[in-house]
C-alpha cells in the first residue's frame, strides 16, 4: 500500500486487500502502508522481511539441478587458466543436494532424436563439472539457494546454445525418468489474467479433447496435446508432449493457452502419473 493518497482512500484500499486475500494463505499476512518517495515505513518492511524463516535445505539427497539457460563458451572465460577447453555453461537452480567441482554428472533428457519409424529416442549425456560460479565467486561446491553457473566439459555439437534449457542435471542413475506423456490434476483459473476481450468474457473455458496447450514443468516449456480427460470433475488431463521431458510424480505444472496472439496462463496442477520411454530406447 502506498500512503501518497487520502486517509479515506487508504482505508478503502486496506479493505480491498483484506477482501482479496480472504480465505487464502495470505489472509493473516501483514498489510503495511508505505511511501517509497518519503521512505515511510520502509524500515518496518525490512524488519518483517528479516523475520521470514530460512527454508530448510536438503543437503543429503543426490544433487539435482534445473537448467534455465545455457550458452557455449571457452573455459578461459570461466576460470583463469591457460587451458583452451570448450564447454557449455548452464545457469541452473540447485533444488537439493550438493554438487562438487569435478563431479561426474548426467544430463536428461540429453540428445533427442527420431528413428526412421518416427519413434523418439533419447540419449542421456554424461560429463563432469569443470567450474562452478555464483555471481563472481568461484566455488568448490554449490548448495541449494539461488542460481549457480555450472561449466560442463562436453562436445558443443551435443549441447549447443540454449539446447540445455529445461534439462535436469544430477548424479547418473538418480534422476527422474524421461516421459512422453503426463497426467496432470488441473485447477483452472476462475478468469483470465490481463486479457480484455471485445465481448467482455473473461472466463477461462474448459480444456477440450485434442486441444494443444503449453505445459510448463520446472523450467521446461513444451507443447502438449490433450489426449484424455478423466476424473470426477474432469480435472485429470493427459498430455501427449511434443518433446520428452524429465519429471516425476508431484511435480508442479502450469498450463497456458494461446488466446489471440499471446499465450496466457489458464491453470495449474501437479503430475499424478507419467508414461516413460523404455530403458531400451535410452
Spell out what each predicted region is:
Residues 4-5, 156-282:
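C-terminal effector modules of nucleic-acid-centric enzymes and ribosome-associated factors
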Amino acid at each position: 500500500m502506498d500512503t501518497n493518497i487520502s486517509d479515506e482512500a487508504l482505508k478503502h484500499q486496506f479493505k480491498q486487500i483484506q477482501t482479496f486475500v480472504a480465505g487464502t494463505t495470505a489472509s493473516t499476512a501483514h498489510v503495511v502502508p508505505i511511501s517509497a518517495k518519503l521512505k515511510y515505513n520502509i524500515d518496518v518492511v525490512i524488519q518483517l522481511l528479516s523475520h521470514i524463516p530460512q527454508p530448510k535445505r536438503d543437503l543429503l539427497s543426490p544433487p539435482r539441478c534445473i537448467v534455465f539457460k545455457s550458452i557455449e563458451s571457452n573455459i578461459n572465460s570461466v576460470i583463469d587458466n591457460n587451458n583452451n577447453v570448450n564447454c557449455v555453461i548452464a545457469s541452473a537452480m540447485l533444488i537439493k543436494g550438493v554438487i562438487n567441482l569435478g563431479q561426474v554428472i548426467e544430463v536428461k533428457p540429453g540428445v533427442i532424436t527420431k528413428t526412421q519409424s518416427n519413434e523418439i529416442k533419447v540419449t542421456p549425456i554424461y560429463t563432469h563439472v569443470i567450474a562452478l560460479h555464483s555471481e563472481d565467486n568461484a566455488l568448490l561446491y554449490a548448495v541449494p539457494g539461488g542460481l549457480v553457473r555450472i561449466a560442463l566439459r562436453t562436445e558443443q555439437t551435443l549441447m549447443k546454445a540454449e539446447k540445455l534449457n529445461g534439462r535436469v542435471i544430477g548424479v547418473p542413475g538418480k534422476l527422474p525418468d524421461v516421459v512422453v506423456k503426463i497426467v496432470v490434476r488441473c485447477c483452472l483459473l476462475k478468469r483470465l489474467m490481463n486479457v480484455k476481450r471485445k465481448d467482455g468474457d473473461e472466463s477461462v473455458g474448459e480444456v477440450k479433447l485434442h486441444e494443444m496447450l503449453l505445459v510448463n514443468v520446472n523450467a521446461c516449456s513444451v507443447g502438449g496435446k490433450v489426449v484424455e480427460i478423466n476424473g470426477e470433475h474432469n480435472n485429470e488431463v493427459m498430455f501427449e508432449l511434443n518433446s520428452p521431458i524429465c519429471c516425476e510424480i508431484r511435480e508442479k505444472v502450469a498450463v497456458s493457452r494461446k488466446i489471440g496472439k499471446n499465450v496466457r496462463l489458464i491453470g495449474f496442477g501437479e503430475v499424478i502419473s507419467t508414461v516413460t520411454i523404455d530403458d531400451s530406447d535410452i
